[in-house]
Amino acid sequence: MTPADLAELLRNTAAAVLAERGLDAAALPATVVVERPRNPEHGDYASNLALQLGKKVGANPRELAGWLAAALAETDGIASAEVAGPGFINLRLEASAQAVVVTNVLDAGDRYGHSDAQSTHNINLEFVSANPTGPIHIGGTRWAAVGDALGRLLSTQGAGVVREYYFNDHGAQIDRFASSLIAAAKGEPTPEDGYAGSYINDIAAQVLRQAPDALSLPEPQLRETFRAIGVDLMFTHIKESLHEFGTDFDVYTHEDSMHTSGRVDQAIARLRETGNIYEKDGATWLRTSAFGDDKDRVVIKSDGKPAYIAGDIAYYLDKRQRGFDLCIYMLGADHHGYIARLKAVAAAFGDDPATVEVLIGQMVNLVRDGQPVRMSKRAGTVITLDDLVEAIGVDAARYSLIRSSVDTPIDIDLALWSSASNENPVYYVQYAHARLSALARNAAELGLIPDTAHLELLSHDKEGTLLRTLGEFPRVLKTAASLREPHRVCRYLEDLAGDYHRFYDSCRVLPQGDEQPTDLHTARLALCQATRQVIANGLAILGVTAPERM
């Protein structure tokens, strides 16, 4: 019996008890919360349903809890139901009911934990979207890991998800990039506002290999040649780095296309129809302050050129026209102002501002022995995705970046994350999977096959803890997807790995010496097989490998 099964049982029992006593069953919440007590002595699960309902139905919460506990105690699978404090209900499950989760996991396989909770959503998930003026920096690397994991997580809950990279190839930064390449090709110093790093010299050399006569071209053609070829080369490198990191996108949208295709003009025309565009001081303004922004925004500047937000407006409309009902933007720490701005754009088009969700990621620092690390020569003073992968590997890099809430700055200790020790969280989880894989190989050599026929024998405390943790996985995924918090999957996996290691140290799984295999051995083997499956499922969501050997 999983927590979801128990919650449904509790709700149905409460509905029957309330009806029997002439109380209002309509007061029942749509979702009943069942949690594991911090103190295992209080039971396997606990609920505060009676405390929630008491006042609503005109009953004393503790008395109501007593009615519910009495009814639950008569239910198959419930070993005991007791009232605690002002109206909590503590529940213990029978071993056979608790162990059903093993069968659930093995039957579902790599789909265990999946649901249709987000199936009504068609989501555009935009992340990374770094400027094509240099390698992916460490902040963008965090989004590459978290965004990819979030996309996988939302997919497990039934959402349609398109992962999208918005390619910022329009504007002043591209002009500075081209100027930097030209200076490098000529052997001149980097312009004052230009881009530095050996990658600029590398790209400039590649441009000259593709266009040997570029430096002899007139200025407009010279600049366009270095801009076009340089941006293409840089973006190719970015995509290769992301692919090697395990992050790929379904769609790449070019900002420049918003302007050259006329979509900016079309979007502004649509906004004029809503009455939310006006002219002032020779410029064209969007009335965003009417929709929660701190001020109105210039859309077309007085010189006739589109402001930066013009591209954002066209891009939002483009997403909606492609059929997305939810647009998630993952932005850097310096983009807090964009939250109100993007929601105001949605509202100006007549959409619910909730159509837009903005996640803001905080800073990432690399440390070794407590001291900041400066690594990259290729990108000047910037730490890049490639630097991090070179230092600790793809798995550790992804896991370390996903493991903390995105609104929390993080320090990545390179010594810790590259160590083969239990203090390294990704090693700890992966080692549990490798240990389980070795156990499966050893069992096969003995001719033992996991068997779910006698799961009621799994009555040891450590077995019970492991079973309950396995049962939590679907709820963890559902909650993590709903809150857009893939770090919850990391923390769950660490708890599961810990529960498994403690179980393994206390409960012998395989027969030793001349000992004959028993039903308990094969039941424990089934429990181990289920644990291995759930760890693999969780790591897959994170884009981290589940090694067979370590």
Curated annotation (Swiss-Prot):
Keywords tagged on the record: Aminoacyl-tRNA synthetase, ATP-binding, Cytoplasm, Ligase, Nucleotide-binding, Protein biosynthesis
InterPro entries linked to this entry: aa-tRNA-synth_I_CS, Arg-tRNA-ligase, Arg-tRNA-synth_N, Arg-tRNA-synth_N_sf, ArgRS_core, DALR_anticod-bd, Rossmann-like_a/b/a_fold, tRNAsynth_Ia_anticodon-bd
Localisation: Cytoplasm
Superkingdom of the source species: Bacteria
Cellular component GO terms held in the UniProt record: cytoplasm
CDD domains with a match to the protein in the record: Anticodon_Ia_Arg (cd07956), ArgRS_core (cd00671)
Entry-linked Pfam families: Arg_tRNA_synt_N, DALR_1, tRNA-synt_1d
One term of GO molecular function: arginine-tRNA ligase activity
Placement of sequence motif 'HIGH' region: 130-140
Residues spanning the signal sequence: none
Entry's Gene Ontology BP terms: arginyl-tRNA aminoacylation
Catalysed reaction equations from the record: tRNA(Arg) + L-arginine + ATP = L-arginyl-tRNA(Arg) + AMP + diphosphate
EC number(s) given by UniProt: 6.1.1.19
PANTHER family, per database record: ARGININE--TRNA LIGASE, CYTOPLASMIC, ARGINYL-TRNA SYNTHETASE
Family to which the UniProt record says this protein belongs: Belongs to the class-I aminoacyl-tRNA synthetase family.
Subunit field text: Monomer.
Name this polypeptide is given: Arginine--tRNA ligase
Species for this entry: Mycolicibacterium paratuberculosis (strain ATCC BAA-968 / K-10) (Mycobacterium paratuberculosis)
